[in-house]
Amino acid sequence: GSLVPASTASLLMGPYNVPAYQCGVHCVMTNKTGVGTFRAPGRYESCFIRERLLDMAAADLGIDPAELRFKNLIQPSQMPYNAGRTRADGDTVFDSGNYPQGLTKALEQIGYEQTNPKRWIDDTGRYHGLGIATYVKNTGRGPYEGARIVVSDTGQVDVYLGITTMGQGHETTMAQICADSLGVPMDIVTIFHGNTDYIPFGGGTYGSRGTVMGGNAVHLACQNLQERILSLASTYLDTEPANLVFQRGEIFRKGEELGPALLSLGEIACLAADAPSIEGEPPGLETTAYFESDQLTFSYGSHAAHVAV
């Protein structure tokens, strides 16, 4: 279909500062497809085209391929960098990154500067060569992602995700995000996914969006839940929320975090069961949050290889 050629065109210029370019793609129906969509469609196609063109240009100009790349990489001071309307639904905006630093580190790993010439034949007749390439990859596609968090009266924290894991490791990643954002030990957090009875809406797991979108949904839910926890605790303790701190799964008086806890998370969950009589809120200690985004975020990197054939 159109996914691979469209993605190839949208990222063809990669991490380079190209003021103006035009790209056309053509789709051809065939029953002898050379490659198919599996992971990151259009990414390796665009990288191969671009990086080979750079190598060819460097050879024509008689300069080092790495030097040509450094001369044309987008600089950190140019961030956020608007690459223009390279996709159907809007401009491509690189939000952050230090592309020259990434390439420098990759070259250091293979001793690029100390290796001259860059292509040679050793005493055994093997051909050696050094290759380098850089890339950017769009991730975090919206429009939204959701998470629901429920705290039991034993203090157990259950997190229900709108995304579904298929080996990506969301159970670990989302538990870490929840523990850090909410202020609880990671071992009391349990992650659930793939059940629309608990959270009916989700955007799906694809395009490296899980951590960006799902992680932000978990973080947002944790912030909402922490506000509720402090509100319940302050009402019960007859003080202001600003005078309390919630960390390590317990309530402390501000400035006395190393002292005895005033309330545990389980005790706060029990208070939440009587919430209507305490603060006029619905009973139960839980929250659902949806994170929305209309922009992509971009990862980046550089690869360097020493190959002998």
Give the predicted meaning of each segment.
Residues 1-46, 122-309:
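Gly/Pro-rich active-site capping loops and adjacent beta-alpha segments
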Residues 58-67, 237:
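Short, charged, surface-exposed loops that flank catalytic or proteolytic processing sites
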Residues 70-151:
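Accessory "access/gating" subregions that flank catalytic or transport cores
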